[in-house]
Amino acid sequence: MPVEKIQIRRDYVLQYMVNNDYSLNQLALEIGVSPATLSRVLNGERRPGQLVIGKMLHYFNLKFEDLFYYDFVDKSQ
């Protein structure tokens, strides 16, 4: 049975960090999340919760679909 999983558009965030010469720690501080949380979300180890999604959308001034997408995972496997 497929399950929706919210994923971040990792390439967008990484390119933003390169373009603005930001470290992961600097960006996390700017967004208002812990560096560990940002790292786990970017690496797919953690799904972003509502608070993280809200903070990131506010910081980047983007719509949900511009920064995140739904991935469908088969739970039966």
UniProtKB/Swiss-Prot annotation:
Alphabetical list of Pfam families matching this protein: HTH_3
InterPro entries in UniProt: Cro/C1-type_HTH, Lambda_DNA-bd_dom_sf
Lineage: superkingdom: Bacteria
Domain HTH cro/C1-type stretches: 13-67
PROSITE patterns: HTH_CROC1 (PS50943)
Feature: DNA-binding region: 24-43
Subcellular location: Cytoplasm
TM segment ranges: none
Any GO MF annotation of the entry: DNA binding
The keyword Cytoplasm is annotated on this UniProt entry: yes
SS bond list: none
Assigned GO CC terms: cytoplasm
Keywords: Cytoplasm, DNA-binding, Transcription, Transcription regulation
Gene3D superfamilies (alphabetical): lambda repressor-like DNA-binding domains
Keyword Transcription regulation: yes
Main location: cytoplasm
Listed name of the protein: Uncharacterized HTH-type transcriptional regulator YvzC
Organism: Bacillus subtilis (strain 168)
